[in-house]
Amino acid sequence: MTLQTRRTFLATLGVAALGIASGTAEAAGTALAQRRKLKKVGLQLYTVRDMMKADLPGTLRKVAAAGYKEVEFAGYFGRTPAQIKELLKKNGLTSPSSHIGLDILEKDSVRAFADAKAIGHQWVVVPWLPEERRRTADDWTAIVTLLNQLGPQAKAAGLRLAYHNHDFELKPVGGLTPYDMMLTETDPALVDFEMDLYWVTFGGGNPLDYFNRFPKRFPLVHVKDSAGPPDNKMVDVGKGKIDFRAIFAQSDKAGIKHYFVEHDQPADPLATIRTSARYLTTLRY
C-alpha cells in the first residue's frame, strides 16, 4: 500500500469510526429518551397536613404549582364532598383515593363510601390499625375478615377498597407474617393494597419480592425515601437509598397505577414536595 493510499484508508477509517461512535451515542441517547417516565406524580396530603388545616384552598394551589396532578386525601378538614370536588377542579387536580380510618368505616361505611364516590375517588384506603387490634394472630384474622366484608360494600358503591401498610405488618405474629397473610387471604377481586415503599423496606421486606409473589395487587404506592442504616430516617424522595428505578420498572407486574409522594415529618413541607416532584418528573426507568 502506498503512503497516499494508506493515508486515504486511515482517513476513511477515521470517518467511519466517528460515524459508528456517533451512531452509538445517538442510539444511546434515543434509548434513554425512550425509557419510561411517570405520567402523573401524586401527593399524599398528609405530608402537608398542617398547611391544609390552616389554608386548604391555598395549599391545593401550591401543590398543583409544584407539579402534582393527583392528590390522596387524609381528612377533609370540615369541607363537604361538593366543596372538595370544586377545589380539585379549580386547581386541575384529581383525587383517585383517600385514607379513611377503619373506625369511620365501621361506624357508617355507607356514608363514607357515598362521600368518597361524590368527590370522585376510586379507592378508599384503610390507612392504619391501632395497636390493640393487631396484637395476636386472631386479631389479624379478624382484620382480614373485616376487609373481605368491606370490599363488597365498596364495590357496591362503585369503589375499590385498599389497605395501606406500615412496618408492623411485616413483624411475625404467632408464626405468621401479617402482610403475607393479608395478601393471601383477602379476595383479590375486592381488596387492593397500597404499598408504602418506605415502610416495607424499613420492616425488612423487599417490594420486588412482593410484586413477584402477589402480582397486580398494588395499584397504589406511597413513594417515600429512606436515608438507610443506621437510623433509616425519612428523607425527600430522591435523596435517599431506595432504588425507585428498579421498583418502578416492575410497575406492570405490580399493577401500579398511582404514585403518591409522602413524608411523615418534613422539616419544610413545601420544600419537600417541590424537591420530590422535581426528582420524580425527571426520573427515567
List where the protein language model places each region.
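N-terminal secretory signal peptides and thylakoid transit peptides that target proteins
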Residues: 1-17
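Active-site acidic/histidine proton-transfer and metal-coordination neighborhood
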Residues: 14, 70, 94, 102-193, ...
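C-terminal segment of N-terminal export signals and the immediately downstream linker at the start
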Residues: 24-53, 62
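Acidic (Asp/Glu)-rich catalytic clusters
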Residues: 32-36, 61-65, 79-95, 108-121, ...
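Hydrophobic faces of well-ordered beta-strands that scaffold small-molecule active sites
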Residues: 39-44, 71-73, 95-100, 124-126, ...
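Conserved, mostly hydrophobic/aromatic
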Residues: 43, 63, 71, 88, ...
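Acidic-and-aromatic substrate-binding clefts and catalytic sites of carbohydrate-active enzymes
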Residues: 49-53, 72-82, 101-108, 131-135, ...
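Gly/Pro-rich active-site loop or hairpin
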Residues: 60-61, 170-176, 199-257, 265-271
